[in-house]
């Protein structure tokens, strides 16, 4: 039954009761009946509107079954768990190579992946693209001599397009401000140097990370001297 039909029936009933009712008591009955009828019509109208605009009704599934119901977080974890195919390398210093900075990949926490090679103490780039290049060294000494000590760390590139070594990143530090006085205690000093930057590289470019005073390198702890690239 539609709302219009319900309203029409209530109005006809009110007219019939008004004709039969007489006196004050009948008027009160008509008033109560009219109020009840109004509330009934209002309730029916409200219910009709709620059903019409689907405010109430059958509940929809919040998580429908099927391939479209993949949880975004689960999907992200699944994607991150897949092995990346981007070139990456992280090599560390060979602590047994005295008097020189020699890189090696066959060591714990070191790797060469997806085409990167270590050849002649240089990293060889496998593909064109943007790369993050980074390196860190740690120097250690005891006391300060009469002459200044300058420590340098440099990352260089030999490109395929021009066979000339070009410095990409470089830093210099001096750990000693003045000479240790004669007879005074020679205190130890430490100087870390970190280099890092993003560069456009070409396939078969060669990268090197070098220092000027390898005798000052500190190999006391692993992970202090390293060199690497990451394709972006």
UniProtKB/Swiss-Prot annotation:
Parts of the chain on the Cytoplasmic side: 1-35
Entry GO terms, CC: external side of plasma membrane; extracellular space; membrane raft; phagocytic cup; recycling endosome
Transmembrane segments: 36-56
PTM comment text: The soluble form derives from the membrane form by proteolytic processing. The membrane-bound form is further proteolytically processed by SPPL2A or SPPL2B through regulated intramembrane proteolysis producing TNF intracellular domains (ICD1 and ICD2) released in the cytosol and TNF C-domain 1 and C-domain 2 secreted into the extracellular space. The membrane form, but not the soluble form, is phosphorylated on serine residues. Dephosphorylation of the membrane form occurs by binding to soluble TNFRSF1A/TNFR1.
Molecular function GO labels: cytokine activity; death receptor agonist activity; identical protein binding; protease binding; transcription cis-regulatory region binding; tumor necrosis factor receptor binding
Keywords: Cell membrane, Cytokine, Disulfide bond, Glycoprotein, Lipoprotein, Membrane, Myristate, Phosphoprotein, Secreted, Signal-anchor, Transmembrane, Transmembrane helix
Ranges for domain THD: 87-232
Site entry (Cleavage), positions: 34-35, 39-40, 49-52, 76-77
Entry protein name: Tumor necrosis factor
Originating species: Sus scrofa (Pig)
Lineage: Eukaryota, Metazoa, Chordata, Craniata, Vertebrata
Encoding gene per record: TNF
């Amino acid at each position: 039954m539609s709302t219009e039909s319900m309203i029409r029936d209530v109005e006809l009933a009110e007219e019939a009761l008004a004709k039969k009712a007489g006196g004050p008591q009948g008027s009160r009955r008509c008033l109560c009946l009219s109020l009840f009828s109004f509330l009934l019509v209002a309730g029916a109208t409200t219910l009709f509107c709620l059903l019409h605009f689907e405010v109430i009704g059958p509940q929809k599934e919040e998580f429908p079954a099927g391939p479209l119901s993949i949880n975004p977080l689960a999907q992200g974890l699944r994607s991150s768990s897949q092995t990346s195919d981007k070139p990456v390398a992280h090599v560390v210093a060979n602590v047994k190579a005295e008097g020189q900075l020699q890189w090696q990949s066959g060591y714990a926490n070191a790797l060469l992946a997806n085409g990167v090679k270590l050849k002649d103490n240089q990293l060889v780039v496998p593909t064109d693209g943007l790369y993050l290049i980074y390196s860190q060294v740690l120097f250690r000494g005891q006391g300060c001599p009469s002459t200044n000590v300058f420590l340098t760390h440099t990352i260089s590139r030999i490109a395929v397009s021009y066979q000339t070594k070009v410095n990409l990143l470089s830093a210099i530090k001096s750990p000693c401000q003045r000479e240790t006085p004669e007879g005074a205690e020679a205190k130890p000093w430490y100087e870390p140097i970190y280099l890092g930057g993003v560069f456009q590289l070409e396939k078969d470019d060669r990268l090197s990370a070098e220092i000027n005073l390898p005798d000052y390198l500190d190999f006391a702890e692993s992970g202090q001297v390293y060199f690497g690239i990451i394709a972006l």
